[in-house]
A protein has these predicted regions:
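Gly/Pro/Ser/Thr-rich low-complexity, intrinsically disordered segments predominantly at protein N-termini
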Residues: 1-148
């Protein structure tokens, strides 16, 4: 449900703009180089929500290189992976903005890439509207993400 709300709000905002939103399953090949074949890339991730603003990164197998925005919804089984492993992968790959969405605590942490490292940018909970920093004037209504 959180994914559907996030994708819906982003889709409505991005309508007619150059960026595109993709829900999971959408494959991202983080460290692919120009000369690599897609099947040779070993760092594959499938974020819950992905926003790509550079159409040249898109092909029929997904996204080649770092997307602009990634949102991950925590679950008990993925919590450590999303907060540590993926956090570090996305940071190293150059994903400009990373949202960690916790449906248990009904909260969102927003990290923004600053000089190659993520800096905690924002925190929000039910009733808040959080700014998507890489998209001008884009706000996500968390009361729609975490309905009562």
């Amino acid at each position: 449900r959180a994914v559907a709300s996030l994708v819906g709000q982003l889709y409505a905002y991005l309508n007619g703009k150059k960026c595109e939103v993709y829900p999971s399953p959408f494959t991202v090949r983080l460290f692919e180089q120009e000369e690599d074949r897609p099947e040779d890339v070993d760092t594959l991730v499938e974020p819950d929500v992905t926003v790509v603003c550079d159409p040249s990164k898109l092909d029929n197998t997904g996204c080649k290189g770092a997307p602009d925005l990634v949102m991950e919804i925590l679950s008990p089984s993925t919590q450590r992976h999303d907060k540590l492993t993926k956090f570090n992968l996305y940071q190293r790959a150059g994903v400009r903005e990373y949202w960690i969405v916790d449906t248990d605590s009904k909260s969102v942490q927003v990290f923004l890439l600053d000089d190659g490292r993520y800096a905690a940018k924002d925190f929000g909970t039910v009733g808040d509207k959080l700014k998507v920093n890489i998209l001008e004037n884009c706000l996500i209504d968390l009361s729609q993400v975490f309905p009562n």
